Amino acid sequence: MSGLVALCRARASASSSLFNSVIRPAFRNFSTGFADTQNKSLVAQMKEEMLHMDINSMIGSSMPLGMMRIGTIIHNIEMNPGQGAKMVRAAGTNAKILKEPAKGKCLIKLPSGDTKWINAKCRATIGTVSNPSHGTKKLYKAGQSRWLGIRPKVRGVAMNPCDHPHGGGEGKSKSSGSRGRTSVSPWGKPCKGGYKSASVKKKKKRLAEAAAKM
C-alpha cells in the first residue's frame, strides 16, 4: 500500500515539473504577447482619436473662416455673416484660404482663379463638393434631356426679327453691319455676363492690393 502511495506522489511531482518547465512559459509568452498587442492597438487608437479630434481638419465641418487654417480647402461660403452659403456650391468645386485673417477679413482663392476678401465671421464648409464628374456626363439622345425636365431651346438666329434680336437677315447673321452684334437675350440684354456694373477703378485697386499682399 505504501509503495502505491509513493508511486502516485512521484507521478504527481513529475507532471507538475513538466507543467512548470514546458506549458507555463509558453502560456506566459502568449499572455505577454497578447498584452503587448493590446497596448499597441490602444496607443494607435488613441493617436487616431487625437487626429480626428481636430475639428479644423475634419471634412464636412462648418465654422467661421477666421477659425480655419491657411491652405484649407472649403466650399459653401457665405458672403455676409448669417446670410447662408452663396459661393462655391457647384458640383466638384472648391476654394482655398490663402492668408490669415487681416482686419477681420480672409483672402480666398475662388475656383475661377480670382481672389476675394471675405468677412472672417462668414461660415464655410471644409472639403470639396461631391460629384466632380458631373460636367463630363454625356447625353446619348435628346430624350435623356427630356427625362431631366429640360425642354428644347430654339436658337435666336432661327427666329423672325419680331421674335428675337438675332432673327431675320440672310443666312445666320445676327444683325447687319461689319462688326455684327454681341449675343443678347430676347429682351436685348447681353447674355454673356450681362451689363458690367462694377467700377473699373475699384476693381484695379482691389487687384493691386491683393497682388501687393501676396
From Swiss-Prot:
Record the organism: Arabidopsis thaliana
Q: Where does the protein end up?
A: Mitochondrion
State whether it acts alone or in a complex, and with which partners, per the record: Component of the mitochondrial ribosome large subunit.
Question: Which InterPro entries does the record associate with it?
Answer: Rib_uL2_dom2, Ribosomal_uL2, Ribosomal_uL2_C, Ribosomal_uL2_CS, Ribosomal_uL2_dom3, Translation_prot_SH3-like_sf
Q: Which UniProt keywords apply?
A: Mitochondrion, Ribonucleoprotein, Ribosomal protein, Transit peptide
User: From start to end residue, where is composition biased (Basic and acidic residues)?
Assistant: 163-173
Give a Gene Ontology cellular component term annotated to this protein.
ribonucleoprotein complex
Q: What protein name applies here?
A: Large ribosomal subunit protein uL2my, C-terminal part
Bias (Low complexity) occurs at 174-185
Q: Which residues form each disulfide bond in the chain? A: none
Q: Which family does it belong to?
A: Belongs to the universal ribosomal protein uL2 family.
Major subcellular site: mitochondrion
Reproduce the miscellaneous comment text: In Arabidopsis the N-terminal part of this protein is encoded by a mitochondrially-encoded gene (AtMg00560), while the C-terminal part is nuclearly encoded (this entry).
Q: Which PANTHER family match?
A: EXPRESSED PROTEIN, RIBOSOMAL PROTEIN L2
Q: Where is the transit peptide?
A: 1-30
Does the keyword section mention Mitochondrion? Answer: yes
Lineage summary: Eukaryota, Viridiplantae, Streptophyta, Embryophyta, Tracheophyta
**Positions of the region Disordered?**
157-214
Which Pfam families is this protein grouped with?
Ribosomal_L2_C
Q: Per the record's keyword annotation, is Mitochondrion included, yes or no?
A: yes
Q: A GO BP term, please?
A: translation
- What are this entry's molecular-function GO terms? structural constituent of ribosome
